[in-house]
Structures are given as C-alpha cells and as structure tokens.
Amino acid sequence: MEREIDRRIGAAVMRALNRSIVVKRELSRKARLSIYRLIYIPVLTYGHQRWVMTERMRSRIQAAEMSFLHRVAGLSLRDRVRSLDIREGLGVEPLLLHIERSQLGWLGHLARMPSGCLPLEVFRTCPTRRWPRGRPRTRWRDYISRLAWERLGVPPEDLMEVARERAVWVSLLKLLPPRPGSG
C-alpha cells in the first residue's frame, strides 16, 4: 500500500499541476483552490476508504498536501508559516481528517448492508491460510475499530450496532475533530 501512495504522490499529473499551473501568478487563489479540490485530492485519495493508515503514510500524505497548499498560498518553506495557519487562511480542512471521515463513513455503509452482500462478507471473513513469519499486517477491520475507538470513543464491541444507526453515525462523523498536532 505504501508503494501505491508513493506512486500517487509522484504521479505525472500531480507534478505537472504542481510545477506549471499552480505556481502561475495569473491564476486567482480561488482557481488554484478549485484545482486542489477537483483534481489533486481525488487523484491522491482514490480508493482511500480501504487504506490501513500507518504513521509513515500519514506523514507522506500530509507532506504532499502541504506542499501543494504552500504553492496555492504563494508561500515557500522559508516563510515558516504553520500548516494550521495556511489551512485556516485557505479555508481547507486537513486531508487526513477527510480520509478518516470517509473511512468511517464506509464502515457505516458496511454495517447497514443486507446480509449476503459481497463487501460485508469480505469484511466479516477471517482468513484461514497460514500467515508468513513476523508481525502480522494490520487488517482493515482492526484498523477501523481502533480508529473509531480513538477518534469517536465507540468501543469495538459496540461499533457495528452504532454504525447501523445512520442518524447517530452521521452526527458522530460530523463532530469528528482534527487530530491533535495535525497542523
């Protein structure tokens, strides 16, 4: 998965946008923000609902996001402006918050699916094959239950029941605060 993130960050579309279009002074800040919202974020986060986020992936995504936002704001790293201040100035929520909210939203969809749907069956499946040596990889189910516990305060044993209640789940996701120290 990390190679996929690295590939997306270094994609030709991103580099071309970052180097040529976004740095043009002729474009308004509003137009550059539109490019950020309509092209950059979807290319970077395609399929993000199923990602298991590690600290390294979080760091890489945040660095790519802030690199783009620095250019949108017309700033360089030498200006030493905090990420939080740049985001507030541009009116943009943290990309990691968007990813976490979408991942938890996908869990809500899974919880409300009727029995027999393929995504729900894959979610419930326990692999029977033998694992390779070393630390086991984190499964999406374990990652998402830990995320819900840390960020929403929903215990893992109650997670599916709470996620089935659409109104409650949506209100919890709307109240999801940014991670401390993410700015």
Language model feature labels by segment:
Residues 1-183:
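Short linear motifs embedded in intrinsically disordered, charge-biased segments
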